[in-house]
Amino acid sequence: MKEIIHICFSDSAIGSVKYAIKKGVMEGEKVIGLVDDLSNGPIDDIANMNRRIYWFKKIYIEEGNEISEIIKSYYKKIIKDIMKFKDEDIYLWYGNSAKEICGMLHILSMLEEKIQNVYTINVSEITYNTGKKNEYTPRVVGELIPEKLGEFIGRRKSMDFERYSSLMALWDKLKRENSNLRVYEDNQVKSAHIDYFDDMILCYTCKKFMHSVRTIGEVIGKAESYVSDTFIFWRVTELIRSEKISHRGNLGFMRELEIKKNNR
C-alpha cells in the first residue's frame, strides 16, 4: 500500500489531520501545509514574496512582521517537501472557501507531474444534523472535529488531466484578475471588491460602543463565504479611517478596541 501525504491550508486543519492520524482515525505518513491565506492580497507572482509580505504587513495589524516570517518559512518548507515527493498518494484537504480552494489551486500548480497520485477531499460535501436547528455544512477543514475526518477518505476524488486543466484554468483566471479579495459565492471562487464585507460589518456594528470582537465574530459566523478575523479586523480599521465607525481603545489590538456605527 502506498504511503499517504496529507496537505492542508490552515494551522487548525494541519493540527486536526495530525490528531486524526495519531488516534487511528485514518492513515497518513506525513502532514504538510500552506497557511498563507490566498483569498486576499496579490497572487499574480506568488514566487516573489515581496508583494505578499507588503500585504501581510498591511492587514496583519497585530503581528505583521512576525506572520511574514512564519509564512515565508512555510513556503520554503512545502517547496522542499514537494521536491522530495516520489510515488506517495497525495490528499489535498479543503472546504468550500476561497482560502482553502486558492491554497489548493496553488499547490496543484506545483504538482503537474504528480497528478496521477493526487486526490482531493472536500469537507463541504457532508451536511450534518440535516433538518435540525443545528444543521451545518463545514466551510473549512478546521470547522470539523478530528474524529469526523475519517468519514471523508472514502469520498476522495482522483485527479485526471481534464479536471486538472479545468482547475488550472480557474487559477490562471484568478491570477490574471489579481483582485485583492476572492470569495466563495454561487458555488465557485470569484474575484471580489475589497469592500465586499463592509456592509455586513456595518450591519453588525451597534450604535453604542461594543467590543470589536463581537462584530467580527458575527460577520465570520454569518457570512456565506468564509473569511478570517484578520481580514475583517483590517476592514474595521479601514471603516474607522473613513469615519463610518467610531472607536475607543487601542486601534492596533482587536480585543482592546471598542467600536460603534456613526449616525449618518
Label for each model-derived stretch:
Residues 1-67:
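A structured, charge-rich N-terminal accessory region that forms the first stable segment of a protein
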Residues 61-105:
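Long, hydrophobic/aromatic-enriched structural stretches that serve as scaffold segments
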Residues 86-152:
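Internal, hydrophobic cores of structured domains that mediate oligomerization or house catalytic pockets
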Residues 135-210, 214:
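A conserved mid-domain beta-alpha-beta active-site/ligand-binding segment of alpha/beta enzyme cores
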Residues 216-229:
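Short helix-coil junctions and helix-kink-helix linkers
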Residues 233-237:
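Short, hydrophobic-biased segments on the C-terminal half of alpha helices
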Residues 240-250:
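A short, conserved structural fragment
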Residues 250-264:
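Short, cationic-aromatic polyanion-contact patches
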